[in-house]
Structures are given as structure tokens and as C-alpha cells.
């Protein structure tokens, strides 16, 4: 009987979440605006009239920096998990995390050497332009 209690709690929780989401969507549908004029379609940003088109392509460097952040942020989570259990891990855990940190440093050195962290023009391209 005690094992089934966990399933009932999960079922009730799922039902409550679905009912809450459906209720929020329903209330916003019934209370929301029904007309689509030019003034209601445009975004309102601190009373400033919008200028230009907001959907433009970002340079690829933004994508690369975001990917590097996600990758190195996950490693920070692993390091935090190791730091909370450092006494239980012992010397074996210390050696494993040392290898892990060395792999991180090698990856960072590779990215730095490959120029993935550079935002400006490539130095090689600048040298070619200066020779002309």
C-alpha cells in the first residue's frame, strides 16, 4: 500500500499542474484583447517608439561563446558535486578530478590557440591586408 501512495501523489501533482496551466491559458484567452490593430501588434518598450527590424542575424561568435559557456558551466556543476563529496572520494577522487581539470585546461588552451575566443578580425587576415 505504501508503494502505491507515491504514484497517487505523482498523479495528483500532474493533474494539478495540467489544470493550473489550462486555467491560466483559459483566463488569458477570455480576458485578453480581441482586436489586432497596428498599435497592439508593436512591442512597447519604455515608451520608446521602435525603430528598425528586431529580427536580425547575430554573428556566429555569439553562438560559440554561448556553447563554450554551457560546456564550461556543466564542468562547474561537476566540480561542485565533487567538492561536496571530497572526503568520501579520497585520493582516487582527487586524481580523477585532477585529470578532469587538466582535460578542461587542455580544451581551453586548444580553443584559445585555435582563435575561437577572438572577436576581431583574424591576425593572419590583417597581415595579408597590410602587405598589399
Curated annotation (Swiss-Prot):
Reaction(s) this enzyme catalyzes, per UniProt: a quinone + NADH + 5 H(+)(in) = a quinol + NAD(+) + 4 H(+)(out)
Subcellular location: Cell inner membrane
TM segment ranges: 7-27, 62-82, 91-111
Enzyme Commission number: 7.1.1.-
Main location as per UniProt: membrane
UniProt keywords, alphabetically: Cell inner membrane, Cell membrane, Membrane, NAD, Quinone, Translocase, Transmembrane, Transmembrane helix, Transport, Ubiquinone
Record's keyword annotation contains Disulfide bond: no
GO cellular component: NADH dehydrogenase complex; plasma membrane
Similarity comment: Belongs to the complex I subunit 3 family.
Subunit structure: NDH-1 is composed of 14 different subunits. Subunits NuoA, H, J, K, L, M, N constitute the membrane sector of the complex.
Protein name as annotated: NADH-quinone oxidoreductase subunit A
Gene name, Swiss-Prot/TrEMBL: nuoA
Amino acid at each position: 500500500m505504501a508503494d502505491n501512495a507515491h504514484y497517487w501523489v505523482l498523479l495528483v501533482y500532474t493533474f494539478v499542474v495540467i489544470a493550473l496551466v489550462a486555467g491560466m491559458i483559459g483566463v488569458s484567452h477570455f480576458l485578453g484583447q480581441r482586436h489586432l490593430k497596428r498599435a497592439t501588434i508593436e512591442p512597447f518598450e519604455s515608451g520608446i517608439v521602435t525603430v528598425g527590424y528586431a529580427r536580425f542575424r547575430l554573428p556566429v561568435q555569439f553562438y560559440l561563446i554561448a556553447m563554450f559557456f554551457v560546456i564550461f558551466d556543466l564542468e562547474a556543476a561537476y566540480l561542485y558535486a565533487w567538492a561536496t563529496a571530497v572526503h568520501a572520494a579520497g585520493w582516487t577522487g582527487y586524481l580523477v578530478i585532477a585529470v578532469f581539470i587538466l582535460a578542461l585546461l587542455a580544451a581551453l588552451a586548444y580553443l584559445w590557440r585555435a582563435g575561437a575566443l577572438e572577436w576581431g578580425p583574424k591576425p593572419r587576415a590583417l597581415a595579408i591586408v597590410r602587405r598589399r
